[in-house]
Amino acid sequence: MKSLILAEKPSVARDIAEAMNIKGKRNGYIENEKYVVTWALGHLVTNAQPEHYDKAYKEWKLEDLPIIPKRMQTVVIGKTSKQFKTVKSLILDKKVKEVIIATDAGREGELVARLILDKVHNKKPIKRLWISSVTKKAIQEGFKKLKDGREFQHLYEAALARSEADWIVGINATRALTTKYDAQLSLGRVQTPTIQLVNARQQEINHFKAKKYYTLSTEIGGLTFQLSTNKQHMTMEDATQIANEIKHVEGNVDSVEKKVKKSHPKPLYNLTDLQQEAYQRYKMGPKETLNTIQNLYERHKVLTYPRTDSNYLTDDMVDTIKERLYALLATDYKSQVKSLLGQSYSSKMRIFKNHKVSDHHAIIPTEVRPDMQSLSNRESKIYMMVAERFLESLMAPHEYEAVRVNVTVGQHIFAFNEKVTRQLGYKALKMNNDNVVKKVAFQKGEKYHLQSLKVNEHETTPPDYFNEGSLLKAMENPQNYIQLKEKKHANTLRQTGGIGTVATRADIIEKLFNLNAIESRDGKIKVTSKGKQILDLAPQELTSPLLTAEWEEKLLLIEKGRYNSRHFIDEMKAFTQSIVNTIKNSEQKYKHDNLTTTECPTCGKFMIKVKTKNGQMLVCQDPTCKTKKNVQRKTNARCPNCKKKMTLFGRGKDAVYRCVCGHTETQEQMDKRFKNKSSGKVSKKEMKKYMNNEDSLENNPFKDALKNLKL
């Protein structure tokens, strides 16, 4: 009898097979005398679409809503059905005695496996592999500590409840809004509050009025002292009056305080922190950063599991510190690593906190030594960020002397503050000792004449627009960016982790860009006209982050077995009915801001101009009519003069390629040039690949609404 191991992806299945010495490669699985390893391809099973319950639902009609199945059904995803059949046959094989779930250790990974097992009506015992890295050692250790699958039943119930609730609310809200206003609109309990976050910041900036304020400074003993005052902002009159009062008054050194203080390194990275800093340093978008970390985790095996919200490690990881340090000998920090290898480590260190680790610990290096030459530029940057933060966390605190000198001048106090480094500690890693200062040699009781008095003018500044990094942080802590009526609501958001999860926030932002609900100009994220209208048209409950916080609060209770998942679904059904009724009864209007005078060749309605990943496209405004045609798009065809990518205008034989340098080619000229480049022979497939013919809509909500619908 054999154990069947179900991984989430082929790459992870191969890693498990290698670690467990399973070498018999077959079509869709790998086996030996003890184990059979197979894999999903992400989700193989998903929630059925509305037309599965009733063919009439294929046509979107407002009067059909809400669509709430009595019992949710699942279907096998068509494009991966072949692999599903393989997995099904293996699960039902009489030679298989048990199933070991080896999908990602988290809510979504549990759902991937359990939907498959439920679909094939599995009756065999289930065990769970729960690991945070896919290195050989981690896999082997994980198999020594397999958990009983029943321990994760509540996790599965929470995952299933989240999936079904998103389907019920998302399908109905999107169909209601789309059919009510005859426009391609999308609503969701995660998307819409994110638009609201961006809008709130935008409104704050728009309504901001700059105010001037003043400070007073003086030179004493060659150093600049600032007036200490209880007023947040002084007026020009206040500052000038004080300056006139004391300009001939002698200053007396009232106190010289010197305190030794310590600063500790920043916490280890969780995913959001890493995404935010990668954007600040390298302008890498959240999705790009996540994909890069995923590569370092799965392919190179040099980083631990990326989708984590924790900044800490568990006590049992103390003994793994040195093997991780050995791996970092391959980096430019070899000398610092050698020094750290000579130290001992304890679970009393600040980085070890069991109670602050839920599913996965912070992102840190694994024991696998990286081949830095084989890493891409992005991979190298991200790996070194994680390595640096890990090394800093193991080094001594930065120790400095905080010096404060108070000089009394009449009834006023002027202060000088400085930090003098005593021990670099963790800051030695980057040698950023920026604390070189003039020697402070004041003594209490000394008298000084003021060398100058200066009134300094300042101006208040508005908050910054969100960028892709700061928006992630705002989604994690929305209570810091929006006004809430009750304090308990802020606590709920804080405790549940805000809008979305570390695993979904990057996708949410990308989806909103694609929906044309938000846009980024010069790194500043703003709400589009369409996004503002969505907020105006949407029921208020869907624009507040409180909804997703309340959901998450209950989902966490379901995970812990303290709340019934069916009660949660019943609440979502009632909520959906309310949302649909609100939209049906609304008297508001939607106005297309991108409507053209071009008539749709299919139905005759005016078409709208939309952005795509590589250009622009005309799409029929009627959501039931799928007519579309290219206006322009970027291609992979290079200009023969300046080598930049050319833009395609039109289609077929009349197509024209233009470059920003002014060079223009017809389709015929392009075909001829391409044939010459390929020795007179080129296939349609090669041409299509070369042209990167991408015609998917960036702001088409139907693609998301009709597929996974993770709103």
UniProtKB/Swiss-Prot annotation:
Site feature Interaction with DNA, where: W60, W167, R175, R307
Top EC class of this enzyme: isomerase
Renumbered residue ranges of the record's region Interaction with DNA: 186-191
SUPFAM superfamilies: Prokaryotic type I DNA topoisomerase
Biological processes annotated in GO: DNA recombination; DNA repair; DNA topological change
Pfam families with a match to the protein in the record: Topoisom_bac, Toprim
GO molecular function, one term: magnesium ion binding
InterPro entries xref list: Topo_IA, Topo_IA_2, Topo_IA_AS, Topo_IA_cen, Topo_IA_cen_sub1, Topo_IA_cen_sub2, Topo_IA_cen_sub3, Topo_IA_core_domain
Active site annotation, chain numbering: Y305
Domain Toprim: 2-135
GO CC annotation: cytoplasmic replication fork
Residues engaged in binding Mg(2+): E8, D104
Domain of life: Bacteria
Names of the cofactor(s): Mg(2+)
Positions of the Topo IA-type catalytic domain: 152-580
Catalytic reaction equation(s): ATP-independent breakage of single-stranded DNA, followed by passage and rejoining
Keywords assigned by UniProt, alphabetized: DNA-binding, Isomerase, Magnesium, Metal-binding, Topoisomerase
E.C. numbers: 5.6.2.1
Biased composition (Basic and acidic residues): 683-692
Residue segments, region Disordered: 672-699
Record-stated family: Belongs to the type IA topoisomerase family.
Main function: Releases the supercoiling and torsional tension of DNA, which is introduced during the DNA replication and transcription, by transiently cleaving and rejoining one strand of the DNA duplex. Introduces a single-strand break via transesterification at a target site in duplex DNA. The scissile phosphodiester is attacked by the catalytic tyrosine of the enzyme, resulting in the formation of a DNA-(5'-phosphotyrosyl)-enzyme intermediate and the expulsion of a 3'-OH DNA strand. The free DNA strand then undergoes passage around the unbroken strand, thus removing DNA supercoils.
Protein name: DNA topoisomerase 3
Organism: Staphylococcus haemolyticus (strain JCSC1435)
Gene from which the chain derives: topB
